[in-house]
Regions:
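Internal alpha/beta scaffold segment
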Residues: 280-282, 287-335
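Noncatalytic scaffold domains of N-terminal-nucleophile
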Residues: 28-49, 53, 61-62, 66-235, ...
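Residue-level micro-sites within transmembrane alpha helices that shape
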Residues: 3, 20-21, 62
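Ser/Thr/Pro/Gly-rich low-complexity linker/stalk segments immediately outside membranes or between
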Residues: 23-27
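Bacterial N-terminal signal peptides that target proteins for export
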Residues: 1-10
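Bacterial N-terminal signal peptides
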Residues: 9-22
Length: 335
């Protein structure tokens, strides 16, 4: 009977996991952590700990995923947040079914290519800072609906319960690490162009130092409000504030670069449509991999990479050679 390899987390890493299982063994250092009953992996140990605590308290994988994602919105706001979008790949053991939730951002209904042109010259505006540090590139967010859909289908916690640890983290604050400090430092000029962003990340006029405490009371307030009613985000006061910010970016007086408004309207928020999709299924050397389909390309390109690698006997190569073969293949697929 064919083995089944099921990935039930946010994101798609299954292809690489299976590939590594096929590579020759290499001496490994002792594990730094072991356990059973579940695992959580993120880029930040505080968010990871929140997910583990949810599991220890009896929550399931979906409860932990939402709580962890909300915490990442606090400690890793530059790449994760309630104002963005994403995907979920979920395996439900009860019915042996894999589903995917597509909560990616969507372009406003009136968006068009001309909006990215300089109104004075007609030339395409530079990507940074003009196009990405303005209202132009802001899509209609789907993260919150992704969380609520997953919890409603498979969770055991309410949205309020899942958001509670992140609310506490945002209110009490957290120690700034090197990654957070560098992100602010690298983007200082852009952050300083917007009053609210400046006040949050540059309260002293300079980037925070490692070890200082960062708080985000406005995010905590937002989490509290949507915990009571997610509709506030799409059809209530939060939605109106989002649209106002997109259409009238809160810049400082005389910002250092041109900041243009975006096209999002309250109708765009109201009309946002979440999609529950059939996953992409890939067979690889007796394993079955599931991942996100379009508009994500990860599973499709990953499947192409694995199809190519099936032509090589990786287990007959030493590990560095096998990894080089795999990396070269992935680079070609991603090009």
């Amino acid at each position: 009977m064919r083995n089944r390899f099921i990935l039930a987390t946010i994101g798609l890493c299954a292809a690489l996991l299976v590939l590594l299982n096929r590579l020759p063994a290499l001496a490994q250092p002792a594990s730094v952590a072991t356990g059973s009953g579940g695992a959580v992996a993120t880029v930040d140990d505080r968010a990871t700990r929140i997910g583990i605590d949810v599991l220890k308290a009896g929550g399931n994988a979906i409860d932990a995923a939402v709580a962890t994602a909300a915490a990442l919105g606090v400690v890793e706001p530059f790449s994760a947040g309630i104002g963005g979008g994403g995907f979920m790949v979920i395996y439900n053991k009860a019915d042996d079914q894999v589903i995917t939730i597509d909560g990616r951002e969507q372009a406003p209904a009136s968006a068009n290519v001309e909006m990215f042109n300089d109104p004075n010259t007609g030339e395409l505006l530079p990507m940074s800072p003009n196009r990405i540090s303005s209202g132009l590139a802001v899509g209609v967010p789907g993260t919150l609906l992704t969380w609520t859909e997953a919890l409603n289908r498979y969770g055991t916690l309410s949205l309020a319960q899942a958001l509670a640890p992140a609310i506490a983290l945002a209110e009490k604050g957290f120690s700034v690490d090197a990654t957070f400090a560098k992100q602010v430092q690298d983007n200082q000029a852009r952050f300083a162009a917007f009053k609210s962003t400046r006040d949050l990340y540059l309260p002293t006029g300079a980037p925070p130092i490692v070890g200082s405490i960062s708080k985000n009371p406005d995010l905590a307030k937002t989490y509290r409000l949507v915990a009571k009613s997610p509709n506030l985000f799409y059809r209530g006061e939060i939605g109106k504030a989002i649209v106002q910010t997109v259409q009238q970016p809160p810049t400082v007086e005389n910002p250092p670069f041109v900041v243009l408004p975006g096209a999002m309207t309250t109708a765009d928020l109201n009309d946002y449509d979440l999609h529950v999709r059939t996953p992409v299924a890939i067979d690889y050397r007796g394993y079955q991999l599931y991942g996100m389909g379009l508009p994500s390309s990860g599973s499709i390109t990953g499947g192409e990479a694995l199809e190519i690698l099936e032509g090589f006997e990786l287990d007959r190569l030493d590990r560095p050679q096998a990894l080089n073969k795999a990396n070269s293949n992935l680079k070609c697929i991603s090009a």
